[in-house]
Amino acid sequence: MAEPKNILFIMFDQLRFDYLSCAGHPHLHTPHIDWLASKGVRFTQCYVQSPVCGASRMSSYTGRYVSSHGASWNGVPLKVGEWTMGDHLRQLGMDALLLGKTHMRADAEGMRRLGLAPDSIIGARLSECGFDPIIRDDGLWAFGPDGAYDDQESPYNAFLRAEGYDADNPWHDYANAGIDNEGNIASGWLYENARRPANIREEDSETPWLTRQMIKFLEQDAPGRERPWMCHLSYIKPHWPYIVPAPYHDMYGPDSHKPVVRDARELENPHPIYVAFTDNAIGQAFRRDDVREAALGAYMGLIKQIDDQMGVLFKHLEASGQLDETMIVITSDHGDYMGDHWLGEKDLFHEPSVKVPLIVYDPSPAADATRGTVCDALVESIDLLPTFVEVAGGMPRMEMLEGYSLLPLLRNAKVTGPREFTISEYDYSVTPMAARLGVAPRDARLFMMRDARWKFIHAEGGFAPMLFDLDSDPDELIDLGRDPAYAAVRDACYDKLFSWARRPSQRTTVSDQQLIDRRGKSRRKGIVLGVNTADEIDAELLEKYQGKARQSHGE
C-alpha cells in the first residue's frame, strides 16, 4: 500500500448507523461495507451537525457548524464567501469533483450583488458548493399543485427517457412507483405501496445508475488526470420514497425487522416540542405497525442494494489498482427514526436520527496498526474536511474549520479523541411544528450537546431543556430535563454548551498565526504609544518624526 493519492468520499442519504451487519444488525447482511470496515476504522460515535439533509451536508462541505455557515435548512442558500471543500483542496493541488446529490442552494442574491455570473467558473463553483460536478442530481424530482420541488434538470430522468421509460417524470413513475393489480401507477409516496417492486429494471434504478457513473469516471477520466482528486459520490438512497426494485422488495419481512424502540413513558407528560413532532402526519403514520413494516422492509432492501453496489465499486477499484492509492470514506447525512420514539423521518436528536455510520479506509502504511478496528471516540461530520486537507498535504485552516483531523485516530490506535462533547443544531422554523408551537423563526432552534454520558438539548423560545442519561437509559426513553434531581447535571451541560456557543469561528480571513506574527508590529510602522520621552525606546522608531521643521506656521 501507499500514501493516499485520491479520496473517494461516499455519502448515503438517511442511512442509520445501526443498519449494517458490521454495526450489529442481526438480519441485514452488508458484506461489502463490512469488508471496507475490516480494512479501515469504523467509528461508532459519529454525529452530524444537523439532523436534516441540507444543513448537515453544508456542515460536511464547509467543515463548520450550522451557526457558522448559516445554511440552516433545505433550500437555505450557502452564503457567498463560505469556503467549501473544493476551495480548501484545490489550492493544495487536488480537484474536488461531484457525482450525485448535494442539496446545495446557490446564493443567487449574493452572486448578483457581487456581479458574479452563474456561468463563470467561480459562479458555477459557488452554485455547486465548491465542487466541479461530473453529474449533479439531487434525486427528489417531485411535482405537486404548486409545481416542482426542484427546478433543476434531472440527469437521471434524462437517462431513463433515453432508455425508453415513457413518462413526463420517469423518476417517479418507474424508479419510485410500482404497478397495482389494475395496471395503475402505485406511487412510492404511499406507504401501502412500499411492499411492491418498483416498476424499473434493477440495473436502471438510482443506486446502480450512479455507481456506473463512478466506474465510468474511474475508467475513462481518472487515469489521465494530472492532479489528484477528491470525488464526492453522493447517493440519494435509502432516503424515501420507500420503494425498491425486485429482487430487493421482498427480501426483508417482519421477522427480519429489529424491534421498535419506543415506550409509553415517552408520552407521559412529554416535552411540548417532542409532542409537536410525534403528532405530525409522519409521526402518526409510523405509530402504525403496518406502515412501519412496509416502509422498513423497503428501507432494508434499499440498503442491501447499496451494499451490493459497493461490492461492484470496490471490485473495480481493486482490479484497476486504484484501491491502494485511494482513501475511501462511507458515511450518511443523518439517520431515520423508522417508528422509534413514536417518530418517523429524522429532525430530532435521538440516536437513530443524529448518529451516523462512519467508516474510513486509509491505504497509508501508517494506518496498518488500526486496520479492522473500532473507534469509540466522539467525532463529527465536520472532521472529514480537515482530514482531507491533511491527506492533500496541507495544514487545516483552523480559523475557518471547526472540526479536527481524523488522521491521528486512523494512524495511531492509542490516541484519544479530539473532543469532550459533540454538537448538533436544528432550525425548525420552516416546519408546521413551529406554527403549532407558536414559535417565531428566531426562536425555533434546538441545540444538542452530547458528552460521554449525557445528551442535553436546549430549546430556544422559553421551553425547558431535554436530558437523557445514556449510561442508564441508552435507548433515550426517559426525559430528565424537568426533573429537579438533575438540576446540577443540567447546569453542567449548559456550561459545556455555552463554552461552545461563545467561540464561533467568525474571524475567517486571518489565521491565528498571522495574528501572532502581527503582535507589536504597529510600533515599527510608526504607531508609537505609551512613550513619554525619546530615550525610552529605540531611536530608529522615532527616526521619521525627528529633524528640523521645514516651515513654521505658528506665532
For the regions a language model picked out, list residue spans one by one.
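A contiguous, mid-protein "functional segment" used to position or interact
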Residues: 484-523
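Formylglycine-dependent sulfatase
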Residues: 1-457, 465, 474-478, 482-495, ...
